[in-house]
Regions:
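ATP-binding/phosphotransfer module of carbohydrate and carboxylate kinases, centering on a glycine-rich
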Residues: 1-118
Length: 118
């Protein structure tokens, strides 16, 4: 199982289905006020924090920019420092977790910039 299996829209949908037996799209889970959806999003957030902590602990980046459709979930940016702080090796989290400047299509724009002009 790779990170993408869990830390993607499809992964959030699958986690929710396995926990609660209902199939919802990731954006529906993220936007819901339902307690079951909150549990699923919390698990996703904790899994993301553990993944990002590995990156922080190995590379010590100044900033990590989240990408893809789930980067639109504002709650991730609110809870991530709280979830990361106890699991990074430093005394406090110095890495900023940020949304993409041009939205969830930023990755596609960046890839297009790599295409040769000639």
């Amino acid at each position: 199982n790779c990170i993408e299996t869990f830390l993607s829209g499809r992964g959030l949908t699958q986690t929710h289905f396995e926990l609660h037996g209902t199939s919802l799209r990731a954006i529906e889970i993220a936007n819901s006020t339902n307690a079951a959806c909150a549990v699923s999003l919390n698990i996703y957030s904790q899994q993301l924090a553990h993944c990002l902590a590995t990156i922080v602990n190995v590379l010590d980046p100044h900033m990590i920019v989240l990408g893809g459709g789930l980067s639109n979930i504002q709650e991730l940016y609110e809870v991530m420092p709280e979830y990361l702080e106890p699991i990074v090796f430093t005394d406090r989290l110095l890495t900023q977790i940020s949304p993409p400047l041009f939205g969830d299509a930023s990755g596609a724009r960046g890839a297009a910039c790599l295409w040769p002009l000639e």
